[in-house]
Amino acid sequence: MGRPTSHGREVTGTGRSVLGRGSFVGGSGGGNRNSYGRGGGGGRSPFSLLIVVVFVIISIATGKKSNILSSILGGLSSSTNSTNSTSSGTAPMISIPTLPSSIGNTAASSISGVGSAWSGVADNRGQLDTSVHESAREKFYRPTGGDSVTVMVYMCGTDLETKHGMATKDLIEMTKANISSNVNLLVYTGGTNTWQNSVVSSSNNEIYRIADGKMNKLADDNSNPSMTDPNTLVRFIDYCKNNFSANRYQLILWDHGGGSVTGYGYDEKNPNSGSMNLAKIKAAVAQTGIKYDFIGFDACLMATTETALALSDYADYLIASEETEPGTGWYYTNWLSNLSSNTAISTLDLGKKIVDDFIDESNRSARGQSTTLSLVDLAELKATVPSSLSSFARDTASYIENNEYSKVSYARTASREFAKSSNIDQVDLVNLVYNLEQNENDPTIQSILGAVKYNRTSSNMSNSYGLSIYFPYKKLSKVDRMVQTYGDIGMDSEYTKMIQQFATLQASGQIVGGGETTPANTVTGNYQGSTSGSFSAADIDSLIASLISGSLSSESLANIGLDTSSIGFLQNRNMSDETIRNYVLSNRLDASKLQWTDRYSTPKIHLSEEEWNMVSSIEENMLLDEGSGYIDMGLDNFFEFDENGDMLADTQRAWIAIDQQPVAYYHLSTTKNGDETVTIGRVPVILNGDRANLIIIFDGEHPNGYLAGANTDYKATQTETIAKNITDIVEGDRIQFIYAYYGYDGTYLDDYKLDEEYVVGKTAPKVSYVLVKDDNQITYKFTDIYNNSYWTPALKSK
């Protein structure tokens, strides 16, 4: 695997003080705050930040909301008029003023060369594949000439609309399309507290038809059913089928997305209704009896192998994103106009237009952000992928069973991961297979590349080939849920068994490793660091036997993120207890060896190369001593090795700053391809009165980092799906930097904010490293191949 990857830094001077300039926020805010370095990932209770991507703050024309006059109980009905309707029965066109320009686009956009090196398998971006595998079924849609098309957009506006008007923006794009009479563009609206336009009702769910630049309300439903209830989706599709029959159907689901684990949707008006998982989505589209030209997700993270297989019997193509989507989302005007001018246009050409416009518009208005969108042939995927995936799963299970878990773990951690800080455990399937097999001609790789007919990404997204897959590593508590989903959607049983094998060995390594979420020992007066990971063989036997038998205490299970309801996967394995015990005993990081030598000159950590091979990541943590407790400065993946291969302590005591103000910074991800490295992290703030995270990116053209934008910081209990709502930082934005605050006993107490507001000026805020002058101590977090976290002894500033 090689050693973990750091990034460079250049210290620009001494920073401003943090101590004595702030006050407590009062309340826990967003996320999980039970550990030092709460945003770093890889610990036992990782902060479940809901990753999001770039949006532009929109000023929406306001006006009186439309009143709904004709609603019926329990169903959809025709609507005869509206107080906002014109004499022709159509609602007025919604519009917005010119979008504000953003600061810092030059720095954020000039990354054309970053991430261009793809590992092993050739870059498949921007190449339209018109071939069809001989075993693929016939397409459901066959052009006849003069085709009629019904496009169904299921638009759950949620907080994306309430806060940012994102759904309104896309409705405007639809009204600007030249829609012909043989295209029925139908939109179901709901799921949001406040629509940011004067047409769509915030009281009732509604159906609109968009034509001639206007929105005509067709039906409403004042019962406001949850849009994550599959029955609501079924009713919308049935309405469209019964009233706008066509020989070509297209379905787009608009909202948050959470990938294979969570599925689609978050209804802001029905927040306790959860999401619509893949099994429910599959059941809904199956129930309507329609065969679709394509099913698209204008939502995050839904381009998964599981999504594709679940829908392969009901649609010819899938259009979706592996990564989180920018708030700009799909750009609707052009492809709808193209479809109207030729309703028999090939889905390959139409899908290519959707993908190209999405990437190009994102590059224009969300520069510097990671974007992906792919067009997948479900007919071909159904014929080719299941057998090759089954073979890959058997081979991988064989590695795990034959003392090569570390090989699989290395491949998993090295693979392109999506929404990494959210711990949804989705990685690019092609990249995963290549990292494990080192063969670009592997049947699974070739079957996926064959099914992905068109794929594009932003230039900073390498190793994203069009379809991701769930592979557990960060959150073992989700394995049982995915096993259930796999059964419901008919996923390959060999893959299901393999991930349970992997999770079982990982859980065993975690319970034996006994890593620590926090460096509590080092900050409460015991400066010896972690002592876990040094159990005797007898201890290991006992721990593994208790874990696998289900007799381990609830407290011990909680230490590895599990409880008695989420350990079913432990019973589905081919490995004996003895095999597991022997492997873990021979492949573990003994944390007692994480001790500083040469402590009073340049402290260093010495491990053998075999021990370094057990380390998957290293992050530096800094705590400021406030006098009554500690201010947490976060986790940064900066570290250096000397000529002997020993890791050196940071004797400079430098930290990331924005315009010379040291800030709490949490490393999210590092992607390395050849000589190119891209590191992404977040800075928690209050942005214009709302919780948010500034996004910092280090890359080849910006080795000292730049501010790429900001994203909303959701509370972990709000939704498991992922929002598409990052924004550029613009002149006049008001920022207060916030830091987690802990007592001397290691207990999280509150968030500490700088009272002085930082107001963004005409030039982009500058990211740099500065010397920290406040009293501080540092420690390093080591994460091993089982995702255990260990901490070095603390080093106090002199």
Describe the function of each predicted region.
Residues F55-K65:
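Hydrophobic alpha-helical membrane-insertion segments, chiefly the h-region
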Residues G190-G289, A299-C300, T305, E322-E323:
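Catalytic-core segments of thiol-dependent peptidases
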Residues M1-G40:
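N-terminal targeting leaders characterized by basic, low-complexity, disordered sequences
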Residues G2-P4, S35-Y36, G41-L50, K64-S245:
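N-terminal extension/subdomain marker
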Residues G157-T158, G191, D255-G257, Y473-K475:
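Residue-level signal for short, function-critical loop segments
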